[in-house]
């Protein structure tokens, strides 16, 4: 107990020293003039909540303080509490009727109120540009601290995909109220659509810590979590060679949010690569085209689409895509190699397909080639096609030229490799091979003037007149 007197001896002089100013301040706080002056200072500093509290105190002490009503009406208008503000303006005009300046402020209030209502209506009609016009040109001019208008503006900007502006606008809101759930949600969504998923997730998580049952925050947070999980599954399965499973994972991820273009561009590209490996060229082209519709400068998507077009034998399309990709990335040897393959295939596609002319596959044996040649030569001999002689002559030449190449093992190998063959050597006779010789049957063709086209059958000119003999 002896300690307490000692403490009082130390503390009592300090209490007495500070008590007079405290009590004096309490007395000053009840003075309407002092309170009003402080309220005006706080309003000038845009500390509207503090100013509003002081003005409430003024009017409690002096219910007829007209300037306090006007000042409070102005604060309430700034915060878009229009009905309360209208009541204070009306009270001021009761105390001081005929004030043109206050009547003007009241008119501005009604104008801002109507504009805010119109902005909400335009938002429901999805005319988001009109929403911004009402808010920027009217509401925030007369009510610069209107939280409802700022949040509606951020929502309109989000709908217009102006994500950077959403981040900026919600940043101002969170600076004044760091726990504003609507602002946290909108800002998180803006970062999400910019594919900055880590920052988006942090905003969602902060909001959920404040309100774990907030339905929109929960939907946004778990939606993002599931999207990233499905993407990882697609990438992991592709790396393991489980291409069909990977393709289904990519498709599932793309279905989660079709509007998430900044992220979906990578999903489309990943899907395209998997489909190319699966040999599903048509689907791959579609997927890569979706990626390029989002980002036309994506070289990897151009390259993969070129590869996909090779699968569908769209040689010209493949060359076009790969050439563009090569121009954008001239040092990439992989692209250059793919372009060379495409150009070679395009060149090959423009030459005659001798296999097709003889109606045989590319794996046909020498005997198959000879058999097909004999059959077609008999079928299209001009003497047997008097009614369509010109067509028969052309077909006869084609058949002979095809056999000139495919009936010669060396020429066939070179042809299959895609090498250029001297077309002059393809069209006429000049070898020493008679495909109709030997084998127990003798084929003699009679045609006045020799072989059509000036060459004769491959393996000889067969000049003069001769006829079919089946011996």
From Swiss-Prot:
Domain named J: which ranges?
353-419
Q: Kindly indicate where the leader peptide sits in this chain.
A: 1-24
**Keywords linked to the UniProt accession:** Chaperone, Endoplasmic reticulum, Glycoprotein, Repeat, Signal, TPR repeat
**Which Pfam families did the record assign?**
DnaJ (PF00226), TPR_16 (PF13432), TPR_8 (PF13181)
Q: Where in the cell is it found?
A: Endoplasmic reticulum lumen
Q: Domain of life here?
A: Eukaryota
**Positions annotated as TPR repeat:** 32-65, 66-99, 112-146, 148-180, 181-214, 227-260, 265-298, 300-332
Transmembrane portions of the chain:
none
Self-association and partners: Interacts with BIP1.
Q: Which species does this protein come from?
A: Oryza sativa subsp. japonica (Rice)
- Gene3D superfamilies referenced in this protein's UniProt entry, alphabetically: DnaJ domain, Tetratricopeptide repeat domain
Give Gene Ontology CC terms.
endoplasmic reticulum lumen
Task: Tell me which SUPFAM superfamilies the record gives.
Answer: Chaperone J-domain, TPR-like
Biological function: May play a role in protein folding in the endoplasmic reticulum.
Designated name of the protein: DnaJ protein P58IPK homolog B
Stated induction or repression of this protein's expression: By dithiothreitol- and tunicamycin-induced endoplasmic reticulum (ER) stress response.
Q: Which residues are glycosylated?
A: 64
């Amino acid at each position: 107990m002896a300690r307490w007197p000692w403490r009082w001896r130390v503390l009592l002089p300090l209490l007495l020293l500070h008590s007079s100013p405290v009590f004096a301040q309490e007395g000053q706080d009840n003075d309407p003039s002092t309170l009003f002056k402080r309220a005006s200072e706080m309003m000038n500093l845009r500390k509207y909540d503090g100013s509003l509290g002081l003005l409430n105190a003024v009017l409690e002490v002096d219910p007829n303080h007209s300037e306090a009503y006007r000042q409070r009406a102005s604060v309430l208008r700034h915060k878009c509490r229009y009905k309360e503000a209208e009541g204070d303006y009306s009270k001021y005009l009761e105390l001081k009727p005929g004030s043109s300046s206050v009547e003007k402020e009241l008119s501005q209030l009604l104008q801002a109120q109507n504009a805010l209502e119109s902005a909400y209506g335009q938002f429901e009609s999805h005319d988001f540009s009109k929403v911004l016009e009402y808010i920027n040109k009217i509401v925030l001019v007369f009510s610069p601290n209107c939280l409802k208008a700022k949040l509606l503006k951020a929502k309109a900007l989000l709908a217009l995909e102006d994500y950077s502006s959403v981040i900026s606008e919600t940043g101002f809101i969170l600076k004044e109220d760091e726990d504003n759930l609507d602002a946290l949600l909108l800002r998180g969504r803006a970062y999400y659509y910019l594919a900055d998923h880590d920052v988006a997730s942090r905003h969602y998580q902060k909001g959920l810590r404040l309100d774990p049952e907030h339905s929109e925050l929960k939907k946004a947070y778990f939606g993002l979590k599931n999207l990233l999980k499905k993407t990882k599954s697609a990438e992991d399965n592709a790396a393991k060679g489980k291409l069909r499973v990977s393709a289904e994972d990519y498709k599932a991820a793309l279905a989660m949010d079709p509007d998430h273009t900044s992220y979906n561009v990578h999903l489309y590209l990943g899907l395209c690569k998997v489909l190319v490996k699966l040999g599903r060229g048509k689907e791959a082209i579609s997927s890569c085209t979706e990626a390029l519709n989002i980002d036309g400068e994506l070289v990897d998507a151009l390259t993969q689409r070129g590869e996909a077009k090779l699968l569908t034998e769209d040689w010209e399309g493949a060359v076009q895509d790969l050439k563009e990709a090569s121009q954008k990335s001239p040092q990439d040897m992989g692209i250059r190699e793919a372009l060379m393959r495409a150009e070679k295939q395009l060149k090959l596609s423009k030459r005659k397909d001798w296999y097709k002319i003889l109606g045989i596959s590319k794996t046909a044996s020498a005997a198959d080639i000879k058999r097909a040649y004999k059959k077609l030569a008999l079928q299209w001999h001009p003497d047997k096609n008097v009614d369509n002689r010109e067509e028969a002559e052309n077909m006869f030449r084609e058949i002979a030229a095809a056999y000139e190449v495919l009936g010669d093992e060396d020429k066939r190998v070179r042809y299959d490799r895609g090498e250029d063959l001297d077309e002059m050597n393809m069209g006429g006779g000049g070898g020493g091979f008679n495909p109709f010789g030997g084998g127990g049957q003798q084929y003699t063709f009679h045609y006045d003037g020799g072989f059509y086209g000036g060459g004769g059958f491959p393996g000889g000119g067969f000049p003069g007149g001769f006829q079919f003999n089946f011996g």
